[in-house]
Design a protein with these regions (language model features):
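Extracytoplasmic gate region of multi-pass secondary transporters
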Residues: 29-40, 263-326, 392-396
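Hydrophobic core of transmembrane alpha-helices in multi-pass small-molecule transporters
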Residues: 122-139, 376-390
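Glycine-rich segments within core transmembrane alpha-helices of 12-TM secondary carriers
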Residues: 132, 139, 148-203, 315-327, ...
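Long, low-complexity inter-transmembrane loops of multi-pass membrane transporters
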Residues: 207-273, 277, 288, 292, ...
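Central cavity-lining transmembrane alpha-helices of secondary-active solute carriers
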Residues: 70-89, 313-331
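Cytosolic juxtamembrane N-terminal segment immediately preceding the first transmembrane helix
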Residues: 1-42, 46-66, 247-250, 254-274
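C-terminal transmembrane helical hairpin of 12-TM major facilitator-type secondary transporters
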Residues: 333, 340-395
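Conserved MFS/SLC helix-loop-helix module at the cytosolic interface between two early adjacent transmembrane helices
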Residues: 82-123
């Protein structure tokens, strides 16, 4: 029996570590946009949009080229979020294996299209980066459930995976460095396409066919076993629909038989609406920054390509720190786990500090971005990766805390899909920022202030629930 338990533990750890590597090396490639654009400009993708200026023969106006690259990223980031609603539905209803096979097909198609693209077929970048984005986020969605294998550290693992997702953008820095050493863009992306075979093997060996339940049954196992096992039997016991577990964290109903929230009531709750505003505003700030980073660096460096390359490398290197920053947020959200609090209360009490810190980071990041001083951008890069790690890790962790687990895929998909509509605003802002960069930055700073509504609401709710428990101690077990 001891050997069996050790076998389960080993499989859990292998799943955790390989999932972390998968998110770190593949899932968030599309967010290495700045490094990729540097290479694509050298290859003269959309080069026909650069026109000679009247001042000197050697000077060219490439604003049209910059707009095309920004639009490629806008479309990819929009689909990355918007289709997450459909992806969440597929994950909830079709299970892990089918969802991962779809993700691998999309991701492989994206890397293959980049490998087959050329300056003459620059528009292949639109479907290529879109497929990379959608396939990558699907891989992330299927991996976040791994936190259920380690209940005491669930939020930490979820944020850790999201941090790895952010850090994977640095892979395109490696592609950029290899390109400068003589290895072509096409060779690098063919290699990434071949690596998809590793994802297929992990899908069958180290991931469940359906879902990893929360809470975890005793001796739970999954994947392909070498010999007769009870994997199928164990997985058939997983919850197929929402059980009557607990009410909404916002509810004050003292009924003796509380029922789980419906999906509709989750969507209509203040928690969800304010969380959507919180995510949408800060995501727009980050997408706009990434999409315009190359043109901003060119403007601040007065067109010095060596300086632009230096700062692009610095930005990509800081993205590697995402995997180190994200667990801090998870530790904040898990810090009350061992305290004698009511179910769900510990998580909510921890979450408002995480939400507040994330909004504060974004505000400081927006202020630094608005200052037209090139050396300051090193600090801006650090703030950006820290805030982005907190943002996406905190988003997934809060949804898993505040709402029933059986709605996680749909709610995660919905919040990402709606926020995608807001992120489309980055494209018209690109046209405005060329003429009025300072005013756009100031507007985004004031917009960021709206993100503070969400942590304030959660804090007030927790204080209210604490007061109710003091007045009615008999309701503690039901809150």
């Amino acid at each position: 029996m001891q050997g069996t338990v050790a076998g389960y533990s080993l499989r859990y750890w292998l799943t955790l570590i390989t999932g972390l590597l998968e998110c770190l090396l593949f899932a968030g490639l599309v967010f290495g946009h700045a490094s990729l654009v540097f290479v694509l400009k050298k290859e003269e993708y959309f080069g026909w949009l650069c026109v000679d200026t009247n001042s000197t023969m050697d000077s060219k106006d490439c604003s049209g080229q910059d707009e095309q690259f920004s639009l490629v990223f806008t479309v990819a980031s929009f689909l990355n979020n918007f289709l997450t609603l459909l992806n969440g539905y597929i994950f909830d209803h079709c299970g892990t294996r089918m969802t991962r096979l779809l993700a691998i097909a999309l991701f492989s198609g994206g890397t293959l299209l980049v490998a087959l693209s050329s300056p003459e077929f620059s528009h292949l970048l639109y479907p290529a980066l879109s497929l990379l984005a959608v396939g990558g986020v699907l891989l992330l969605i299927t991996n976040m459930q791994v936190g259920n294998l380690f209940p005491a550290h669930r939020s930490t693992i979820i944020t850790f995976y999201n941090g790895a997702f952010d850090s994977s953008s640095a892979v395109l820095l490696i592609v950029k460095i290899l390109y400068e050493q003589g290895i072509s863009l096409h060779t690098s992306f063919i290699f990434l396409t071949v690596c998809s075979s590793i994802h297929v093997a992990r899908t069958f060996l180290l991931m469940p066919k359906t879902h990893i339940p929360y809470t975890l049954p005793e001796n739970y196992t999954y994947g392909t076993n070498c010999g007769k096992g009870n994997t199928d039997t164990v997985e058939e016991t997983e919850i197929k629909e929402c059980p009557p577990t607990q009410e909404s964290p916002e509810t004050e109903n003292t009924s003796l038989a509380p029922e789980v929230q419906s999906f509709g009531s989750c969507v209509k709750s203040r928690f969800f609406i304010f969380h959507l505003v919180w995510l949408s505003i800060m995501q727009l700030r980050h997408y706009f920054f990434i999409g315009t980073l190359n043109s901003m660096l060119n403007r601040l460096a007065d067109g010095d390509s060596n300086l632009v390359s230096q700062y692009t490398n610095a930005f990509a290197i800081t993205q590697l720190c995402g995997i180190l920053c994200a667990p801090w947020n998870g530790l904040i959200m898990d810090r009350h786990k061992k305290k004698p609090l009511a179910p769900g209360e510990a998580d909510l009490r921890s979450s408002y500090l995480s939400l507040l810190l994330t909004a504060l980071q974004c505000l400081l990041f927006s202020v630094c971005t608005s200052i037209a001083f090139l050396p300051l951008q090193y600090f801006t890069f650090v703030l950006q990766v820290l805030n982005r790690s907190f943002l996406y890790g905190g988003n997934a962790a809060f949804l898993s805390i505040a709402f029933p687990a059986c709605h996680f895929g749909k709610l995660y998909g919905l919040v990402m899909a709606v926020s995608a509509g807001v992120s489309v605003l980055q494209y018209p802002l690109v046209s405005v920022v060329r003429e009025y960069p300072f005013y756009v930055d100031i507007g985004l700073i004031f917009l960021t202030l709206l993100a503070f509504i969400h942590p304030t609401n959660v804090f007030i709710h927790c204080r209210k629930q604490a007061r109710l428990r003091k007045e009615h101690p008999e309701t503690r077990a039901r809150l």
